[in-house]
């Protein structure tokens, strides 16, 4: 696949097309990042990509499934039960798939190869900058969620190793704040400082194995529950329509693979919108099966008593669940640096454009700036993770932001793409597509505003 970069308007901002680190970071971990010549990267070039249709399905599924899986049983509880949770996901799936197809269409029309480049080219500079800022904030919040997940799983594993009863206070070295900090400084920080990402394939493998294993464990534990596990109240209907919307952040966070989808589309052997529609439909159906299996079985196992992280609801002594916790920790340890690289790349691009300095002119200070950016990012995410009690509070905020990537930006791209057409007489299909774009933007803005306001309101009352 062709080398990509974060900012596309090089002539205006004085940036070179050889953007070094930033040229590779906002791709899916599974996408080939080897640079090619301009001829090979062009639409008429002999090689449009190396990813097969089946491979693209796997990559999109891998990009979709992740840490949000742990919060789906709690989302079913919030939504008001199994029926409401299923209906909500099925309804959302139509918009999620259409957003992925719209991005591919706009990528093909604009000849851009990353999410933010497509938004920048189709919607203009202001929307492009907002998109980059949103990506930076989203990756920052996801990094916080990753550290909280590490602490959650370590608490359970340490309790078993130290043979401490649930909730009992142990020695200082088993304290949650200490164990999260130690793990972060020993493993995450060293992986985050380097300029290159050399462990992407391992992160992808661990993420896939861990996700499927967690799903299998949750389903098996529902079919053959342990005697000491008793479910709480099983809700059958939502308390209010607002309760259903409160489950939206988890679903948006879980299904958000749109940012990495554009590079995947351009890495395909046949990057055609029709083929891509089949790819994302198959991928989303697979992801839906995994999320629904985990959400339904986890919710029915524990009912309204389910934790925001479903693995915390299981006994510490359960060895099968302990293996799942170990998988999740390993997956998150390698996923945090990748998300951090993405966020750091966007911050770096925004900073250089603000300064009006090209990469080549500022290469002497690149390492010092990279280390400083990494340390500030790492310390802020760690500090917030130490004092935020569970991943549900983080997902409630960044899940609303994920709605912007799923609804708002694709909707704006569709509207702008259709408005740019020079037809004097607009056919009915033109009006339908523009109206659908308006619907996407309106729905996404509502979800973002409602969920973010609700998250802030709940946290202020807590």
From Swiss-Prot:
It is a multi-pass membrane protein. One of its GO terms (biological process) is sodium ion transport. It catalyses: L-asparagine(in) + Na(+)(in) = L-asparagine(out) + Na(+)(out); L-glutamine(in) + Na(+)(in) = L-glutamine(out) + Na(+)(out). Gene3D superfamilies: Amino acid/polyamine transporter I. The chain crosses the membrane at residues 56-76, 82-102, 130-150, 178-198, 205-225, 239-259, 282-302, 319-339, 371-391, 395-415, 428-448. Keywords: Amino-acid transport, Cell projection, Ion transport, Lysosome, Membrane, Phosphoprotein, Sodium, Sodium transport, Transmembrane, Transmembrane helix, Transport. It comes from the Eukaryota. The modification Phosphoserine is found at residue 28. One of its GO terms (cellular component) is axon. It is found in: Lysosome membrane; Cell projection, Axon. GO terms for molecular function: L-asparagine:sodium symporter activity; L-glutamine:sodium symporter activity. Interacts with the mTORC1 complex; this interaction mediates the recruitment of mTORC1 to the lysosome and its subsequent activation. Symporter that selectively cotransports sodium ions and amino acids, such as L-glutamine and L-asparagine from the lysosome into the cytoplasm and may participates in mTORC1 activation. The transport activity requires an acidic lysosomal lumen. This is Sodium-coupled neutral amino acid transporter 7. The gene is SLC38A7.
């Amino acid at each position: 696949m062709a080398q990509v970069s974060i900012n596309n308007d090089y002539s205006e901002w004085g940036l070179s097309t050889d953007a070094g680190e930033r040229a590779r970071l906002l791709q899916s971990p599974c996408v080939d990042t080897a640079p090619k010549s301009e001829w090979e990267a062009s639409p008429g070039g002999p090689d449009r990509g190396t990813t097969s249709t089946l491979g693209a399905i796997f990559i999109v599924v891998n990009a979709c499934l992740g840490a949000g899986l742990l919060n789906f049983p709690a989302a079913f509880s919030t939504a008001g039960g199994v029926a409401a949770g299923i209906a909500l996901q099925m309804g959302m799936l139509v918009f999620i798939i259409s957003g992925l197809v719209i991005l591919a269409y706009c990528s093909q029309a604009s000849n851009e190869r990353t999410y933010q480049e497509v938004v920048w080219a189709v919607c203009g500079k202001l929307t492009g900058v907002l998109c980059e800022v949103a990506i930076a904030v989203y990756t920052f919040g996801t990094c916080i969620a990753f550290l909280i997940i590490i602490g959650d799983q370590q608490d359970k594993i340490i309790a078993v190793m130290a043979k401490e009863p649930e909730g009992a206070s142990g020695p200082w070295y088993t304290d949650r704040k200490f164990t999260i900090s130690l793990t972060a400084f020993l493993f995450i920080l060293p992986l985050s400082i380097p300029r290159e990402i050399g462990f992407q394939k391992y992160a992808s493998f661990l993420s896939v194995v861990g996700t499927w294993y967690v799903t299998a464990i949750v389903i098996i534990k529902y079919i053959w529950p342990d005697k000491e596990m008793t479910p709480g109240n099983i809700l059958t209907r939502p308390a209010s329509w607002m309760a259903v919307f409160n489950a939206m952040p988890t679903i948006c966070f879980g299904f958000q693979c749109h940012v990495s989808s554009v590079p995947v589309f351009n890495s395909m052997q046949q990057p055609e919108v029709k083929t891509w529609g089949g790819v994302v439909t198959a991928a989303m159906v697979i992801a839906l099966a995994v999320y629904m299996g985990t959400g339904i079985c986890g919710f029915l196992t524990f009912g309204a008593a389910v934790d925001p992280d479903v693995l915390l609801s299981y006994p510490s002594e359960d060895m099968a669940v302990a293996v799942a916790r170990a998988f999740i920790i390993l997956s998150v340890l390698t996923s945090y640096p990748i998300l951090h690289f993405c966020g750091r790349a966007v911050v770096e691009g925004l900073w250089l454009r603000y300064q009006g300095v090209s990469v080549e002119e500022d290469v002497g200070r690149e390492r010092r700036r990279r280390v400083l950016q990494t340390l500030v990012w790492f310390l802020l995410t760690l500090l917030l993770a130490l004092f935020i009690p569970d991943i549900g509070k983080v997902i409630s905020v960044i899940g609303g932001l994920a709605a912007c990537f799923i609804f708002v930006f694709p909707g704006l791209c569709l509207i702008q793409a259709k408005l740019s057409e020079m037809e004097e007489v607009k056919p009915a299909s033109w009006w339908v597509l523009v109206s659908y774009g308006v619907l996407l933007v309106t729905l996404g803005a509502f979800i973002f505003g409602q969920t973010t306001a609700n998250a802030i309101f709940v946290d202020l009352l807590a």
